[in-house]
Every structure is written in structure tokens, then in C-alpha cells.
């Protein structure tokens, strides 16, 4: 049978167009409502598997981070403090991108990076830390906490020493470059029996310590005493000197024994080489500053540090506790404060 298909009538075409238009508008409104609802929800932070595993929790709420302030030594202290306090308080820890850019090229750190776009949407509770552990830090309130200050004290994280050492494990190529240099060193034609890393902090501290903090930096006498301490206890030691004031070191460190090597490049903007050299030694001589403290902490062995380098009324002692900075087993040699007493 032949069926003839007639065109829609004019009213029927309008009716179908009307239904289609209404349906489209309805679905678009539904979609927009869902999107708006998503934006109005509180920020949901995914808990990364690596973070949960590292912090010993299968499910953690909220997010903790820390300000990335200062150079390498400061940021190592901030990272380790965040790692320890977040774990202590049962919170997931995330580091700022700036901190990741400083530490990741040198160390095998594991804490995830905080996306800057996400960070800007989080209602942070800023929580200031002293440079030493306080009992109240075991119970810091808040799910979204940003730690502030310049924490760099073993009192925060020494109970997790093994984990901290793992976090600050050098990348293979960084470690191998340092070891290759050390393997080529000799003392009076023979291979050294002991490697002692020496870090001499100069730079801004030369002026800041006496003018601002009523303190001193290491002088020639201190370094001579520190080197002699190791010479008296170890056979054929070699002293690997790094500094941001290498010219001063060459003029003030006694090289007559043939056991001193000026090895570092002193470039503060790229400290990996100097730091790696120090940590691949057996022992440490440090002066002041977090760079030397961390080199000694990672190295282990014997450590000599500059002690009592401020006057008793120094404002520095209000923000810095020597007993919280230097491990009890380290050996301090008192600084010569006489230059301060002349003024």
C-alpha cells in the first residue's frame, strides 16, 4: 500500500519546538544548579596515599602546611617540624611549592606539594611556633593550619630521627658527586683516615651578629681549636672546608699540616654541592647557622660547634635556645666575646 507522508501542520511544528526549548532550558538550569552547589561546598582536600602512609594514618582530615621562609637550612627545619607536628596531631601535611623547589632537587622528600590555587581557597588558621618544642604543640587546634615562624630544633623531630634522615636522603647523583671529590683527596700523599666537614658561616652574620644580636661569629682561634680537637683524636684526618666567605677562610685557617682542603663553592643560591660534601664526611665542625646544624645532624659522628657566642643580655636568646639547637652529645667550644666588650 502506498503511504503518503504529509508534512507537519504549522501548529504541530510550533508545539514540538516549544517542548524542545522548554526541555533544554530545564536541563541547563539543573546543570547550573549542580555546579553552583559544588562551588558552595567547603573545600574538600584529598588525602594522598603517600601522605597517609608516611604519617601512619589511613584517613586524615584537613590539611596542614608551613611557611617557606629562608634558605636551605631554614626550610629543612620547617619541613622536618611540619612533618613531625602533623604526624603528632594526626593531620595530613602538604608543603608549599617554594619549599619543594628548594628541597626536592637535593633530597628524596615525600610530602606532597600544596597547589597554590587550592591554597588560596583554604581558610587557614596561622599558628606561630617558637624555635623549640612546647607541650601545647601536641594538641594544636584546627583542621586547616599553617605553621609560622623559624623552627629548627631537634626537640620537634628527634624522636623521628630515622624518618627525618630518610626524608633528607640525598639523590644518588648529588651524593656520588660529593663522594667522587672526597675519594680524590690525600693528606701528605696518603689517603685520609677520617673526613671532617667544616662549615664557616660568614656573609651577613659578620655584621648582623654584633650590631643586632650582641654576638660574634667564629674567629681564627675557634677554628684552630676545633681542628686540633680532631687531630688529637683521629689519625690522618682531612678537613673539607665550605663557606660563604672562602677568602676569609683561606687567610685565617692554618694549612701548615697539609690536611686542609678548601672545597666548597660558597654559592648560597645553589647550596647542594657544599651541603653534600659536608654530609658525606665522618664528622663536622660548624660555626653558627642552620646550614651547619643540619649538616651535622645528617652526618652523625662527632660535632664541634661554637658555644656561648652572644652576651648574656642578647635579644637573640629570647628567640633561640642553645640547648634546643645543639644535640647534647655535641661538643661546644666557647666563643671569644672580648670584641663585644671593647665597645
Curated annotation (Swiss-Prot):
The gene is FUT2. It is found in: Golgi apparatus, Golgi stack membrane. Its main location: Golgi. Its EC number is 2.4.1.69, 2.4.1.344. It is a single-pass type II membrane protein. Pathway: Protein modification; protein glycosylation. It comes from Hylobates lar (Lar gibbon). Catalyzes the transfer of L-fucose, from a guanosine diphosphate-beta-L-fucose, to the terminal galactose on both O- and N-linked glycans chains of cell surface glycoproteins and glycolipids and the resulting epitope regulates several processes such as cell-cell interaction including host-microbe interaction, cell surface expression and cell proliferation. Preferentially fucosylates gangliosides GA1 and GM1 in the antrum, cecum and colon and in the female reproductive organs. This is Galactoside alpha-(1,2)-fucosyltransferase 2. The lineage of its organism: Eukaryota, Metazoa, Chordata, Craniata, Vertebrata.
Amino acid at each position: 500500500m502506498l503511504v503518503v507522508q504529509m508534512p507537519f501542520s504549522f501548529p504541530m511544528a510550533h508545539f514540538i519546538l516549544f517542548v524542545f526549548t522548554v526541555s533544554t532550558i530545564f536541563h541547563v538550569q539543573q546543570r547550573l544548579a549542580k555546579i553552583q552547589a559544588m562551588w558552595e561546598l567547603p573545600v574538600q582536600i584529598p588525602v594522598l596515599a603517600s601522605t597517609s602512609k608516611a604519617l601512619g594514618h589511613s584517613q586524615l582530615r584537613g590539611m596542614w602546611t608551613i611557611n617557606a621562609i629562608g634558605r636551605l637550612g631554614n626550610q629543612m627545619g620547617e619541613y622536618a617540624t611540619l612533618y613531625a607536628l602533623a604526624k603528632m596531631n594526626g593531620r595530613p601535611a602538604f608543603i608549599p611549592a617554594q619549599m619543594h623547589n628548594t628541597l626536592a632537587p637535593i633530597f628524596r622528600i615525600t610530602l606532597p606539594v600544596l597547589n597554590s590555587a587550592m591554597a588560596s581557597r583554604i581558610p587557614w588558621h596561622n599558628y606561630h611556633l617558637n624555635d623549640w618544642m612546647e607541650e601545647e604543640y601536641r594538641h594544636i587546634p584546627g583542621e586547616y593550619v599553617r605553621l609560622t615562624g623559624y623552627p629548627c630544633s631537634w626537640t620537634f623531630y628527634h624522636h623521628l630521627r630515622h624518618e627525618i634522615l630518610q626524608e633528607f636522603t640525598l639523590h644518588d647523583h648529588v651524593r656520588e658527586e660529593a663522594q667522587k671529590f672526597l675519594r680524590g683527596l690525600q693528606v701528605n700523599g696518603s689517603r685520609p683516615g677520617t673526613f671532617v666537614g667544616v662549615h664557616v658561616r660568614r656573609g651577613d652574620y659578620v655584621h648582623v651578629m654584633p650590631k643586632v644580636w650582641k654576638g660574634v661569629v667564629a674567629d681564627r682561634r675557634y677554628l684552630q681549636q676545633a681542628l686540633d680537637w680532631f687531630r688529637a683524636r683521629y689519625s690522618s684526618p682531612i678537613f673539607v672546608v665550605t663557606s660563604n666567605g672562602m677568602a676569609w677562610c683561606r687567610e685565617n685557617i692554618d694549612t701548615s699540616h697539609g690536611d686542609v682542603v678548601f672545597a666548597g663553592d660558597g654559592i648560597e643560591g645553589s647550596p647542594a654541592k657544599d651541603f653534600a660534601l659536608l654530609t658525606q664526611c665522618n664528622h663536622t665542625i660548624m660555626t653558627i647557622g642552620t646550614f651547619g646544624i643540619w649538616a651535622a645532624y645528617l652526618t652523625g659522628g662527632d660535632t664541634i660547634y661554637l658555644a656561648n657566642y652572644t652576651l648574656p643580655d642578647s635579644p637573640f636568646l629570647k628567640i633561640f635556645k642553645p640547648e634546643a639547637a645543639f644535640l647534647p652529645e655535641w661538643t661546644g667550644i666557647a666563643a671569644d666575646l672580648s670584641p663585644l666588650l671593647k665597645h
